[in-house]
UniProtKB/Swiss-Prot annotation:
Protein name: tRNA (cytosine(38)-C(5))-methyltransferase
UniProt EC number: 2.1.1.204
Main location: cytoplasm
Gene that specifies this protein: Trdmt1
Keyword match Repeat: no
Subcellular location: Cytoplasm
A GO molecular-function descriptor: RNA binding
An example Gene Ontology CC term for this record: cytoplasm
GO annotation, biological process: response to amphetamine; tRNA methylation; tRNA modification; tRNA stabilization
Top-level taxonomic group: Eukaryota
Originating species: Rattus norvegicus (Rat)
Length: 391
């Protein structure tokens, strides 16, 4: 097969390019496009020979796109208009303009690409922009399938639920195509229960999710006390859920993704321990889970990602239950016994599936690295979807 000519839009730090390499699909990236100077420096550091265009997508004419003669598009449009914690401006958000421009010129290309892969946040699937994307796919004659997938389904101890669309220009449906449904598992990964799909009802997309079973004791007929706070801000249900995750042997332990070197600079400062102790999501090297790492990791605490307890022999419950009656200095001393630290940028890159040789230019600051990784994607998930798409 002739190598595919790939156009990489919103190329960032090259997650799509790394996924393409990992998939072993014969391909050549004819152009990568991004406006971020910092991201482009990282991309160039890892792919020095790729044609990188540091310009807006709207600044590229239809004729210029035609000259690139690509037959695959990989893209991860800005997610901020669709995030659950954002304003959800959707089409009215100016950051959506470049993607709307792509949807406008796609049908007007001299030659349509054969393959398309798109990644975005959960929330995109219920946006008006997604509706326009689907209309465009159908008008152009693409067969497509949508997914909501997390790296944990590949045995990676990290939650990062993301929306994906893969599309192929052909008349026959994809062999795994489920019209009007969003698959919650990879094709050919076993039987998918109907409740694990998203379904369309009365023209509206609705995602069905299974309620977590928090009653681990089969002798109990009800979850009494599941909502009461035990320690930190965690209920018995929260603790049971985390224990279930940590006992899932299909998922790797975090220790396989950690660095061996000196990580003292990543220890949480005393003021963060004192102020945010009850908000921290704490994991150990033996844990089989971690929260999604966002671009605010390292700068903000709540909801930006897990922190690592490196003093594994210290019982976290005992520490937290002793805190309420202590003065601030003693609280800090107690919490310091856990030796909590941030995951390093390299460790987050490992969890995101970037290869060992992936790196940053020396001048890229730690804060910038966290931000870039938080805006990136999981390489392994995209790689598997590319393999499925090009089979």
């Amino acid at each position: 097969m002739e190598p595919l000519r790939v156009l990489e839009l919103y190329s960032g730090i090259g997650g799509m390019h790394h996924a393409l390499r990992e998939s072993r699909v014969p391909a050549h990236v004819v152009a990568a496009i991004d406006v971020s100077t910092v991201a482009n420096e990282v991309y160039k550091h890892n792919f020095p020979h790729t044609h990188l265009l540091a310009k807006t997508i709207e600044g590229i004419s239809l004729e210029e796109f035609d000259k690139l003669s690509f037959n695959m598009i990989l893209m991860s449009p800005p997610c901020q208009p669709f995030t659950r914690i954002g304003l959800q401006g959707d089409m009215s958000d100016r950051r959506t303009n470049s993607f709307l421009y792509i949807l406008d010129i796609l049908p007007r290309l001299q030659k349509l690409p054969k393959y398309i892969l798109l990644e975005n946040v959960k929330g995109f699937e219920v946006s008006s922009t997604r509706g326009l994307l689907i209309q465009t796919m159908e008008a152009c004659g693409f067969q497509y399938q949508e997914f909501l997938l997390s790296p944990s389904s590949l045995g990676i101890p990290n939650s990062r639920l993301r929306y994906f669309l893969i599309a192929k220009l052909q008349s026959e449906p994809l062999c795994f195509q489920a019209p009007g449904q969003i698959l919650m598992e990879f094709p050919n990964s076993g039987t998918v229960q109907p409740q694990e799909y998203a379904v369309v009802e009365e023209g509206k997309l609705r995602v069905r999710t299974r309620e977590p079973d928090v009653c681990l004791d089969s002798s109990s007929t009800q979850c009494s006390g599941q909502d009461s706070i035990l320690f930190k801000h965690e209920t018995a249900a929260d603790i049971d859920r985390k224990r279930q995750q940590d006992s899932d042997l299909s998922v790797q332990m975090l220790k396989g993704f950690l660095e061996d070197g000196d990580t003292a600079q990543y220890l949480l400062p005393a003021k963060s321990l004192l102020r945010y102790a009850l908000l921290l999501d704490i994991v150990k090297p033996t844990s089989r889970r971690s929260m999604c790492f966002t671009k605010g990791y390292g700068s903000y605490i709540e909801g930006t990602g897990s922190v690592l307890q490196t003093a594994e022999d210290v019982q976290i419950e005992n520490i937290y239950k002793s805190l309420p009656d202590l003065p601030p200095e003693e609280k800090i001393a107690k919490l310091s016994m856990l030796k909590l630290r941030y995951f390093t940028p390299k460790e987050i890159a490992n969890l995101l599936g970037f290869p060992p040789e992936f790196g940053f230019p020396e001048k890229t600051t730690v804060k910038q690295r966290y931000r870039l990784l938080g805006n990136s994607l999981n390489v392994h998930v995209v790689s598997k979807l590319l393999t499925v798409l090009c089979e």
